[in-house]
Amino acid sequence: MPSLKDLRNRIASVKATQKITKAMQMVAAAKLRRAQEAAEAARPYSERMGSVLANITQAIGGGGDAPALMTGTGKDNVHLLVVCTAERGLCGGFNSQIARLARDHIRRLLADGKQVKIICVGKKGFDILRRDYASMILDRVDLREVKTLGFVNADAIAKKVIHLFNEGAFDICTLFYSQFKSVISQVPTAQQIIPAGVASAPAAAVDGGNAVYEYEPEPGEILSDLIPRNISVQVFRALLENAAGEMGAKMSAMDNATRNAGEMINKLSITYNRQRQAQITKELIEIISGAEAL
């Protein structure tokens, strides 16, 4: 049984931890608001970009004018996975859920005899995936020093992916991230970004219905410029969704930790008071017994 001094030290230690988790919860709440606004602002642009690409693709009928980034290599032997996670932990199962989705995808591909290559964006995903797939990891993108995510960060990742595609390093690229739904709900998502895949979009989903468009310059030339830009936009959206999801998960995790610390403090305080009461009672009995002996 721990002594009263040990219990006092444990209560003080848990109280100090509770102050830290409470402060981290408040910081995450402040950052969440900004991250959520950024993620929600990026969604309409990203969706509109997909709509424009679908319209142009219909205009050329998916013919020979379509760039390779849209049509693909015609093979699916080599898959590149861009796995986006957080740089830091203390956010519950946020990182492990994304990594689990990626690992399941890797296992399916390997079972089908495919070759897999990985780019890790974020330290936590890298730490998880390198345990079993270190030889498949081509690169790790470090964003720890980035205070505010910008389009330039996503563009650098997209250009790296496009460069690898142009060199024939892979056939299909899939982006893994967590889509932000709410503070308590982040959905791990896998999105194919190469080939772009908008050529297969249903006609009903394309804005404009039966409208006729005229393009200048030629649709193929427009696509050659828009598709790399669209890949950058999709990566940027994934990073913003991840940032909002991370802050939501961290806020929730720190709230749970703060409440658990409070419960632990209550239990330790009850134990401390009972032991102190028992000790006082024992001392009183000894004093009374001594007085009676006299």
Curated annotation (Swiss-Prot):
Assembly:
F-type ATPases have 2 components, CF(1) - the catalytic core - and CF(0) - the membrane proton channel. CF(1) has five subunits: alpha(3), beta(3), gamma(1), delta(1), epsilon(1). CF(0) has three main subunits: a, b and c.
Q: Which GO terms describe its molecular function?
A: ATP binding; proton-transporting ATP synthase activity, rotational mechanism
Which purpose does this protein serve, as stated in its record?
Produces ATP from ADP in the presence of a proton gradient across the membrane. The gamma chain is believed to be important in regulating ATPase activity and the flow of protons through the CF(0) complex.
The record, for CDD domains, names: F1-ATPase_gamma (cd12151)
Q: Which family does it belong to?
A: Belongs to the ATPase gamma chain family.
An example of a Gene Ontology cellular component annotation for this protein is:
plasma membrane
What this protein is called in its record is ATP synthase gamma chain
Alphabetical UniProt keywords: ATP synthesis, Cell inner membrane, Cell membrane, CF(1), Hydrogen ion transport, Ion transport, Membrane, Transport
UniProt superkingdom? Bacteria
Q: What is its main location?
A: membrane
Q: Does the keyword Coiled coil apply?
A: no
Which species is this record about?
Mesorhizobium japonicum (strain LMG 29417 / CECT 9101 / MAFF 303099)
Gene name on record? atpG
